[in-house]
């Protein structure tokens, strides 16, 4: 049975690290989806680069996934880094458009990917999907209400999909990082202890472990906070 992988957000800070790891694994083909592939387009025999448009629009998700054809001899896997952060204001200070922006970026895009990837898996041998949630989704923090709510709803989506996915041989999980070691995060918190942060490449290994055992690992949210002090 063949194994094919879809990575959405492959060109972002998290996506690049995860992609670097998963390119070395035993997938027969890897589809790399992102909004901008001009600078870091990966060309390997088993990779396909696909540029996408606004994924909050259902027609764009359908167009992106229509390039992969159902096949009863293929297991399909999807990892998504799609989302965004916004914070710094209380609930009463939060503008409705900012609230909606977080819901659109973090929940609605994930719903659309889950919905249409499920149809692909249903017509194939089976598969697994893994989303990127956030630590604050299950551990509320002030000034992150819209972000936390959107990621919390994403976790509910994942757990529901894990239940329903049993009917079509689809498992669903999420990783839930606190702070990922990226250049942007380092610049925002220059005095932090970077040695305790999880790296994108380490997340790639975790995602691969979930996919390697997809037939019985489902409905889980893998919390990734700080590593032990050395």
List each language-model region with its residue ranges.
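Catalytic loop of short-chain dehydrogenase/reductase
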Residues: 83, 122, 128-153, 158-167, ...
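Conserved NAD(P)H cofactor-binding loop of Rossmann-fold oxidoreductase domains
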Residues: 79-88
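A short, exposed helix-loop element centered on a Lys and neighboring polar residues
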Residues: 114-115, 159
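C-terminal helical subdomain
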Residues: 174, 182, 192-230
